[in-house]
């Protein structure tokens, strides 16, 4: 028995937050006795067309290593991957019966494609929803209407929907989607990755942010401004930013901000690092920080980086946006503050540094959540049971 994780909204085995969530799903399914096949449907030029990691079989049906200079050939490659995927899915189902497909896509055409395949092969289809469906359709009423229509149609082209937040459950329920089709799966984390304490990769104390360097979504600019406030009181602490910016514009803005605040020798941009390197950076940080601003993205989602932060037992300073306050309480298992305010965020960072022994005790309380609510094995079993009800 197996589960296929399919989509064009992630890379694998290396990638971003979606990739990490898929790794946790897959590990949980495998430990519960279910085989996992990951099909990356994106048009990505990759040296590996297929492989296996930690018992997870993965495939890239696009299958091209280099980009052709001819448009007709590129179009042909994009077209033929649909037949390759169909053939691949049939082979998997024949040798390792598929109980369900878990789809990860924001494209209505891609969702329609996998829906038709699932119906043809008679496999249940469960969609993943980790972000606000209308986040890219803000502005005019016509844009919002287009987003609403696409969201509604996409939600009809599946048997079930896994929602990362209660907000998304209510969003779809308010639009006529039956509640029995909706299932809450909060952020998940593989705690085993963070249990082994390794030597610090850096030779100094540091506050750390790990993730895509975004301004509107994760407020990296706010974090930099907050660090500027505390940097004079703590001259031996650096700010380390792991990841790359989502746009060239954001990359330029963030690096210019660091320069303008005279922090070039205090803020470290590591760039993208491998998934295996992340735990050593997180577990050796002084503080793990996330200054996420209030936004439509924050309202509906829950940052996967936060559950990774929690699993380390390192003090966390985070803004109280979206459903973060549902799970975390200021001074109980993390340190929360209001969003969009560098001064207040800096005050909370300073408080943790000034009361570090107590902060470690609070961090250990937060760590307990990763053994229960956010535990990958527990949530994978819940997903399996939900699929059986469809």
Predicted regions and their residues:
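Conserved donor-binding/catalytic core segment of Leloir-type glycosyltransferases
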Residues: 4, 162, 200-218, 224-227, ...
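Nucleotide-sugar donor phosphate/pyrophosphate-binding loop at the beta->alpha transition
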Residues: 109, 121-124, 132-157, 191
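Carbohydrate-associated surface elements
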Residues: 167, 188
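Nucleotide-activated donor-binding/catalytic signature segment of Leloir-type glycosyltransferases, i.e.
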Residues: 242-243, 251-279
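Acidic donor-binding loop of glycosyltransferase active sites
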Residues: 266, 282-300, 314
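Short hydrophobic beta-strand element within catalytic cores of glycosyltransferases
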Residues: 287-290, 308-311, 315-318, 335
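Conserved acidic donor-binding segment of nucleotide-sugar-dependent glycosyltransferases
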Residues: 330-331, 335-342, 351-357
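A short, well-ordered alpha-helix in the C-terminal region of glycosyltransferases
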Residues: 344, 351, 358-373, 382-385
